[in-house]
């Protein structure tokens, strides 16, 4: 059982280790924190913390550094102090959505890089699932004899448009009718939808045209649902270079794999969550991931993560994510 004094010493060692990047000795701890105890007392408490697996001792230094268990205990204390009060939330994402003309991909890309600049670590932002971002309206516009423009408007206000190559001759009224048909039906590909399209279409060519549009929209939705925006990867590489060069490659491979997506998709609440080292993956020991959710207008939500070394400035990152809504 850890005592309150041992917990205070552990917290001080973690913060000094993050600041200095080297093992912390008893004298340095007393000098930096003006502790009113003897070096012998501090050394004894540090030995107790080492026996409890909260600290590690290296052969090349008389000081000690936090273990993963030590970082875990430190972070758990921080999270207990964190309050998720909406009154301090910053509606930055909604501002970015407006600034980027309701283009969610552009807004999230800006957001990932902006958050990386503020946190000084790498960030990952996962796009909201399209199952939550429902299609509100579809419009077909004839540009010329061979090109049509497909405009998709989502309930978030996000707008996308695509150019379609088609020489099919359709009147303005018929284009409106087809647009309304697609807007008013569940366009998930199914035998039932195929029957509806067949009954609605005026010709085999029109039937094929509508089916092609439905397939294209479904393919686009499937690709977009797994979109991840990475900001500040170089910041993570720089931070890891200072501690363990050999760890960079497996970490980058992890971040570029589906495993990170699966991890982020387990986030189901607004609570901030911190995973450290092997808690993330058995092959990882040098990084931590701080995760939370973000929201657009209370209706759409996705996952966000700040990724840095285990010696991360956790308090700053937690406070930063706590302000995001």
UniProtKB/Swiss-Prot annotation:
Gene Ontology MF, one: DNA binding
N-terminal signal peptide: none
Keyword terms, alphabetized: Repressor, Stress response, Transcription, Transcription regulation
Pfam families: HrcA
Domain of life: Bacteria
GO terms, biological process: negative regulation of DNA-templated transcription
Keyword Transcription: yes
UniProt entry tagged with the keyword Repressor: yes
Function: Negative regulator of class I heat shock genes (grpE-dnaK-dnaJ and groELS operons). Prevents heat-shock induction of these operons.
Name of the featured protein: Heat-inducible transcription repressor HrcA
UniProt organism field: Staphylococcus haemolyticus (strain JCSC1435)
């Amino acid at each position: 059982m850890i005592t309150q004094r041992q917990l205070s010493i552990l917290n001080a060692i973690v913060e000094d280790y993050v600041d200095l990047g080297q093992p912390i000795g008893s004298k340095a701890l007393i000098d930096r924190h003006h502790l009113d105890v003897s070096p012998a007392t501090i050394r004894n408490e540090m030995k107790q913390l080492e026996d409890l697996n909260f600290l590690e001792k290296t052969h090349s230094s008389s000081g000690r550094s936090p273990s993963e268990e030590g970082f875990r205990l430190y972070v758990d204390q921080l999270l207990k102090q964190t309050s998720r009060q909406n009154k301090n939330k910053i509606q930055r994402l909604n501002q970015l959505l407006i600034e980027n003309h309701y283009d969610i991909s552009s807004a999230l890309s800006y957001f990932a890089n902006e958050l990386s600049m503020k946190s000084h670590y790498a960030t990952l932002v996962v796009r909201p699932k399209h199952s939550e971002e429902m299609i509100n309206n579809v419009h077909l516009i004839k540009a010329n004899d061979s090109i049509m423009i497909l405009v998709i408007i989502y309930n978030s206000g996000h707008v996308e448009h695509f150019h379609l190559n088609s020489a099919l001759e359709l009147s303005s009224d018929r284009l409106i009718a087809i647009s309304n048909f697609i807007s008013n039906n569940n366009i998930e590909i199914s035998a039932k939808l195929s029957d509806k399209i067949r009954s609605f279409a005026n010709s085999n060519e029109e039937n094929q045209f509508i089916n092609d549009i439905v397939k294209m929209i479904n393919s686009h939705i499937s690709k977009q649902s797994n979109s991840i925006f990475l900001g500040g990867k170089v910041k993570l590489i720089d931070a890891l270079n200072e501690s363990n060069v050999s760890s960079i490659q497996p970490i980058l491979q992890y971040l570029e794999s589906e495993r990170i997506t699966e991890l982020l998709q387990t986030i189901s609440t607004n609570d901030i969550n911190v995973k450290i080292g092997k808690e993330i993956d058995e092959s990882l020991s040098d990084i931590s991931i701080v995760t939370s959710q973000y929201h657009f207008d209370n209706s759409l939500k996705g996952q966000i993560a700040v990724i840095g070394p285990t010696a991360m400035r956790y308090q700053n990152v937690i406070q930063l994510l706590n302000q995001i809504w």
